[in-house]
């Protein structure tokens, strides 16, 4: 058994930092040519962009159509390596759910993580801004070895809360906002499970949009999976694993350089809300960064 306590996992949500570099990743990075790596990085970005555009074009919900979407390629440990997004705060929606999947389901005999599986999640404790942000991810295997994950996160809209539309302005608890689904397997052998789809559809006011959006995420993920397997066939699994890790390393270094360019000092920014709880009223929030 995985040791899951049938409650929210407070340890996994702390793991926003990249997981430690494995020996396989370290060995692979040492052999990567810089020019070949730049080409690889560009291909990964194009794969993510194609996934995002496919999700937008196939989806049914309004938010999906106008770009409230993120599509990512994740390491096999669950870290986000490459992302294409319409709204940037969605960029990390799949990271914690996939670390949850790796932690709890890989070695769990009643679940497992296998080629052709699909995992769905929308509990904002693990990912998303609110319950209407729903994600689907699939693993990518090459010759029986897990290479990475790919997946899409989308604001579907209708989540079955106390108010239609996915944004419950009068909600007083998280349970007022509808669906709360931790990372679960909803498909095997590249087929979505009809019983789980039926359950999810029954919990919303707009079941057809819910199901069409799920299928759009899966279709985009399958396209990305195919593209990634083409890259692995061309460059080899070691190059791919090392390349994803190098993208993570470079991104971290670039972020540190950008932050280091800021002038030392105290930065203040006030923000205003027009509600106090569920009642009208002005609330001022002061943010100070030192």
Question: Over which residues does each language-model region extend?
Answer:
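Flexible, glycine/threonine-enriched loop-and-boundary segments that flank and lead into catalytic domains
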Residues: 60, 265-289
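Amphipathic alpha-helical
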Residues: 90-100, 239-269
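Regulatory sensory and allosteric helical modules in signal-transduction proteins
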Residues: 76-83, 95-123
């Amino acid at each position: 058994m995985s040791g899951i306590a049938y409650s929210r996992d407070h340890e996994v949500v702390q793991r926003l930092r990249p997981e430690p570099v494995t020996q396989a990743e370290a060995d692979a990075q040492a052999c990567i040519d810089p020019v070949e790596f730049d080409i690889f990085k560009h291909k990964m970005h194009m794969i993510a962009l194609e996934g995002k555009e496919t999700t937008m074009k196939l989806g049914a919900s309004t938010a999906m159509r106008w770009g409230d979407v993120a599509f990512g390629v994740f390491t096999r440990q669950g870290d986000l390596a490459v992302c294409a997004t319409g709204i940037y705060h969605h960029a990390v929606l799949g990271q914690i759910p996939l670390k949850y999947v790796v932690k709890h389901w890989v070695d769990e005999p009643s679940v497992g993580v296998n080629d052709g599986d699909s995992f769905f999640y929308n509990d904002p404790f693990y990912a998303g801004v609110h319950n209407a942000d729903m994600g689907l991810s699939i693993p990518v295997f090459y010759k029986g070895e897990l290479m990475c994950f790919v997946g899409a996160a989308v604001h579907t809209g209708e989540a079955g809360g106390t108010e239609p539309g996915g944004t419950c302005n009068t909600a007083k608890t998280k349970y007022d906002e509808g669906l709360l689904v931790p990372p679960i397997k909803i498909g095997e052998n590249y087929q979505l499970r009809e019983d789980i789809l039926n359950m999810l559809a029954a919990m919303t006011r707009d079941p057809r949009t819910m199901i069409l959006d799920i299928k759009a995420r899966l279709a985009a993920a399958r396209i990305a999976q195919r593209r990634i397997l083409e890259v692995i066939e061309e460059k080899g699994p070691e190059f791919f694993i090392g390349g994803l890790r190098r993208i993570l390393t470079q991104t971290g270094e670039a972020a540190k350089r950008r932050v280091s360019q800021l002038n030392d000092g105290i930065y203040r920014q006030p923000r205003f809300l027009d509600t106090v709880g569920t009642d009208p009223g002005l609330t001022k929030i002061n943010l100070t960064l030192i």
